[in-house]
Amino acid sequence: MNIDIVSMAWAALMVVFTFSLSLVIWGRSGL
């Protein structure tokens, strides 16, 4: 099985970006 480091890095980056973005939205909406 070949592990694609670049794909894993992009996946992790998108997860972190989406998570932090949702936290910002939650913070602004007061939830």
From Swiss-Prot:
- List membrane-spanning regions: 5-25
Record's keyword annotation contains Electron transport: yes
Q: Topologically, how does it sit relative to the membrane? A: Single-pass membrane protein
Q: Name one GO biological process term.
A: photosynthesis
What's the subunit arrangement here? The 4 large subunits of the cytochrome b6-f complex are cytochrome b6, subunit IV (17 kDa polypeptide, PetD), cytochrome f and the Rieske protein, while the 4 small subunits are PetG, PetL, PetM and PetN. The complex functions as a dimer.
What is its biological role?
Component of the cytochrome b6-f complex, which mediates electron transfer between photosystem II (PSII) and photosystem I (PSI), cyclic electron flow around PSI, and state transitions.
Its family remark reads: Belongs to the PetN family.
Q: Indicate what this protein is called per its UniProt record.
A: Cytochrome b6-f complex subunit 8
